[in-house]
Curated annotation (Swiss-Prot):
This protein's UniProt keywords: Hydrolase, Nucleotide metabolism, Nucleotide-binding
Pathway of action: Pyrimidine metabolism; dUMP biosynthesis; dUMP from dCTP (dUTP route): step 1/2
Record flagged with keyword Cell wall biogenesis/degradation: no
Keyword Acyltransferase: no
Name assigned to this protein: dCTP deaminase
Active-site residues, record numbering mapped to chain: 137 (proton donor/acceptor)
Role description: Catalyzes the deamination of dCTP to dUTP.
Length: 188
């Protein structure tokens, strides 16, 4: 598997709608200030976080069970900023909608700007022929509240081209997160 370049990313986004909306270059400045960068980089694409958040709370003293997740464990927030409580986490989604080609697998890594503040961004790989908004998981590993900025960069997607096309894609097996929009909670 080889990593795909900025030229390939731009071509696939423009000709095949692989990323929508798409920013063909790296954006580092907003209207009046600097932003955490997003858009096409040399060998990846830096995604933005939308303004839709689900902040984890334990007001119901629930047990976290991935097979039976209680959605009442979250507080919904629509805002340009999300404050994650100490030692807690929040879910969000990307601004961008992805359509992954059949011969590509992506790996997503959190941006160092957040990691250096103790904020870990986790995203599972985007599998061949998966499509949707990416659900982002933010973990605040610090004993202090942590801030996430909507519409700014949060993670980088790396596109790995396969040497051989897979027999069964995510779409073929009707993956449970296929076509997801909005912030999607765990499904068992």
């Amino acid at each position: 598997m080889g990593i795909k370049s900025d030229r390939w990313i731009r071509k696939m986004a423009r000709e095949h709608g692989m990323i929508e909306p798409f920013e063909p270059h790296q954006v580092r400045h907003g209207d009046c200030s600097s932003v955490i960068s997003y858009g096409t980089s040399s060998y990846g694409y830096d995604v933005r976080c939308s303004n839709e958040f689900k902040i984890f709370t334990n007001i119901n003293s629930a047990i976290v069970d991935p097979k039976n997740f209680d959605q009442n464990s979250f507080v919904d927030l629509v805002s340009d900023v999300c404050i994650i409580p100490p030692n807690s986490f929040a879910l969000a989604r990307t601004v961008e909608y992805f359509r992954i080609p059949r011969d590509v697998l992506t790996i997503c890594l959190g941006k160092s700007t957040y990691a250096r503040c103790g904020i870990i961004v986790n995203v599972t790989p985007l599998e061949p022929e998966w499509e949707g908004h990416v659900t982002l998981e933010f973990s605040n590993t610090t004993p202090l509240p942590a801030k996430i900025y909507a519409n700014e960069g949060v993670a980088q997607v790396l596109f790995l081209g396969a040497d051989d096309v897979c027999e069964t894609s995510y779409r073929d097996r009707s993956g449970k997160y296929q076509g997801q929009t909005g912030v999607t909670l765990p499904k068992a």
